[in-house]
């Protein structure tokens, strides 16, 4: 009798374990899919921001030089053309939260994707809707700037909504690590576009690059953007967003796919409770932390990282390097950025957030 009892207990625990393992593998696969789709928004953030680096000289040759401006005015216009997307980033960052609340996290990412698409198409062909494709000239510099600002708005929205989507879809015990992959995707986007710019530059000489090559660099973004938009239609909105928009049934369905049934119900109830609470006291309690977080982002810009990300090829050209060689050197910048982001992700749970931020500040 004891032998049979032992066997029954063993079989019970064995079947329970196998059931849990099967459920866990299934939920992990689904969670990885959702995370990968969301991080494509981060990749496009890096791609759209970094693509300009390979086109600075060409944009100056195409849009600025024919205007016959004085050196100071010429440099100022070139700088504005290159950095114009940042205007859109400010707008996108300011309205991203409101859009996410009104339309949901998924739809916000779709909006960002559409803006990326419009920007990539318009930046590569600013004469579109104005004259024959390929017949544009320096008079369209303002149109080009407009399309870059559109892309910047997409960057601002994606920079906010991609990590929010991941954070709201992931279980608490995996949230921190999965959200960090969005940063990896951003620097990955920079690295990928540096490679793309380099190989496009190899397709012709500087004359071809200044006339047509820069167009292909901007147009290349259409490929990842299209993939992003298609994949977004295969994923759901986040449970929190679904509850906010009175779709609790769908929210529970999503939660069950990444958690066991009992935990899914508990999380759903927690979401409903938190949405009923006022956020003002919570913000007041953590105001200092929020300020520090914002200042970290501000100081990151103050160290001049964007100068390197935007102008690396031009900096290397001052060393009398050819355009393709300068773009090849820029790839190394992207690789170093990517590798150290991986190191940060792998060590953050060992050393903690604060020590790594101190090391980065030093």
Predicted ranges, named:
Residues 11-249, 256, 273-362:
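Alpha-helical transmembrane bundle of multi-pass membrane proteins
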Residues 250-251, 263:
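Short phosphate-engaging motifs
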Residues 257-266:
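Short intracellular "coupling" helices and adjacent cytoplasmic loop segments at the cytosolic face
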Residues 265-275:
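TPR/TPR-like alpha-solenoid helical repeat scaffolds
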């Amino acid at each position: 009798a004891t032998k049979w009892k032992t066997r029954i207990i063993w079989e019970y625990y064995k079947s329970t374990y196998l059931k849990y393992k099967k459920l866990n593998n299934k939920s992990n696969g689904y969670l990885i899919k959702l995370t990968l789709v969301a991080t494509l928004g981060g990749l496009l953030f890096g791609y759209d921001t970094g693509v300009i680096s390979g086109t600075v000289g060409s944009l100056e040759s195409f849009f600025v030089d024919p205007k016959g401006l004085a050196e100071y005015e010429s440099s100022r216009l070139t700088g504005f053309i290159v950095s114009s997307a940042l205007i859109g980033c400010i707008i996108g960052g300011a309205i991203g939260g409101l859009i996410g609340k009104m339309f949901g996290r998924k739809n916000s990412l779709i909006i960002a994707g559409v803006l990326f698409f419009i920007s990539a198409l318009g930046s590569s062909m600013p004469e579109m809707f104005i004259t024959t494709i390929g017949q544009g000239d320096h008079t369209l510099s303002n149109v080009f700037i407009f399309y870059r600002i559109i892309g910047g708005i997409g960057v601002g929205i994606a920079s906010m909504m991609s990590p929010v989507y991941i954070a709201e879809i992931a279980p608490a015990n995996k949230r921190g690590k999965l959200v960090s992959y969005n940063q990896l995707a951003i620097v990955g986007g920079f690295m990928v576009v540096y490679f793309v710019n380099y190989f496009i530059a190899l397709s012709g000489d500087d004359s071809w690059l200044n006339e047509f090559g820069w167009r292909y660099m901007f147009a290349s973004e259409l490929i990842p953007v299209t993939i992003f938009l298609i994949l977004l239609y295969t994923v759901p909105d986040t449970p929190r967003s679904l509850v906010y928009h009175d779709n609790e049934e769908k929210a529970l369905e999503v939660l069950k796919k990444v958690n066991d049934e009992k935990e899914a119900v508990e999380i759903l109830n927690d979401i409903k409770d938190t949405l009923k609470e006022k956020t003002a006291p919570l913000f007041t309690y953590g105001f200092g932390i929020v300020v520090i977080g914002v200042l970290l982002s501000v100081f990151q810009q103050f160290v001049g990282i964007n100068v390197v990300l935007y102008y690396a090829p031009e900096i290397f050209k001052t060393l009398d390097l050819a355009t393709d060689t300068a773009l090849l050197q820029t790839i190394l910048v992207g690789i170093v950025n990517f590798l150290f982001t991986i190191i940060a992700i792998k060590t953050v749970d060992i050393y903690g957030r604060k020590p790594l931020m101190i090391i980065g500040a030093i």
